[in-house]
Amino acid sequence: MGTAAVTAMILTDDIFHMFVFFEILALAQVGIVAASSIDYSYEMALKYMILGSIGSPMMLLGIGFLLALTVSVNVTDIATAVHMGLVDATSPVFLLSLGLIFFGWLYASGLPPFHTIKSGIYSKAEPHGAALLQSFTVISMISIVLIMYRIYSALPIFEVLVVFFSILAMILGVSLALTQTDFRRMIGFLAVGELGFIGLGIGLGTQYAITAGLFQALNEIIITALLFIGFGAIVNATNEVDTRKLGGLLAYHPKVSLMLLIGGLAMAGVPPLSGFQSKLMLVQASLSCGFPEISILAIMVSIATFVVFVKTFYAMFLRPKPNDLELEGKSVPKSMIFAMGVLLIIIVLLGIFPDVVTSGISNFVGGIL
């Protein structure tokens, strides 16, 4: 159901249908969390639904204001009316519609102020479920913001808002990840921070920047899937999520350890992995737009992400094993190792041959600008 919903969100040119499919997706996300066997998963699913009862109606109200102004819910018709001056882009109703839909987008994306609940649902889902949740979040985030871009790009405040909340997500995501001892929460906060990089590219607004943002989105889906599955494998082998109670795992699970290390380096933007290529493009895009301070911030966040992974990797894999930690005879399912291996190959290939993907993304972006 979730896959069908995000596919429909990508394909639709009707903003009301987009909202309907987003609601279906939200139900699927709640179901994935509630079906988990992890403690307090029901509580987290309920919290997500309660917040959804605030964010979703606001988005729908914003769509209603657009309908009142343009007498249409077709995105192309609305965008044409706005850019041809048939709708006053400075009218209070139009600006209010932007604010309401933007608030709904923040909820859908898990950007601040919804970053804690989004990272929470990741930590309460099964590993494969968390990977699905993150992919759903990334795709819905892109689908909604591209629709908003087509409608509101004439307003300078739109791009400012996207960049501001994206930067806020980057800073809060990595800052909160540094404080975590539960590695599932740590990955959840880092995943939210990486969403900020995606929003940053789209908010800068140039073809190259949006291409970089969409390439970052693809990398985000693949890299976080590898990390969620890898850390899920560690939970499967140790029944433990607290990094303070782990250690010495490198000797017992070297394959998982190596693949998690490479995945962490990819998320931090270390060459020649795929995360480096997309973040390099984002830094270049920021410089070309005249914002060197954003480029510096992106580099600093990437360095902080690297520090998070070095700290976590040492705690879990390199330091001596605690005496009360039982690891003998506990293996990781081969299916998890296989899935991680496939994702790792894709990460390496995209890092070495980024043009295979970026050229197609650039053509797509050129078609919507």
Spell out what each predicted region is:
Residues 149-152, 264-282, 344-365:
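Alpha-helical transmembrane segments and their membrane-interface junctions
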Residues 5-93, 107, 176-242:
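Alpha-helical multi-pass transmembrane bundles of energy-transducing inner-membrane proteins
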Residues 44-47, 124-135, 241-257, 291-301, ...:
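Membrane-interface alpha-helices at helix entry/exit sites of multi-pass transporters
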Residues 95-161, 188-189, 255:
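Short helix-boundary/re-entrant hairpin motifs in multi-pass inner-membrane proteins
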Residues 32, 82, 122, 149, ...:
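Interfacial segments of multi-pass membrane proteins
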Residues 112, 224-230, 293-328:
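Predominantly late transmembrane helices and immediately cytosolic-facing juxtamembrane segments
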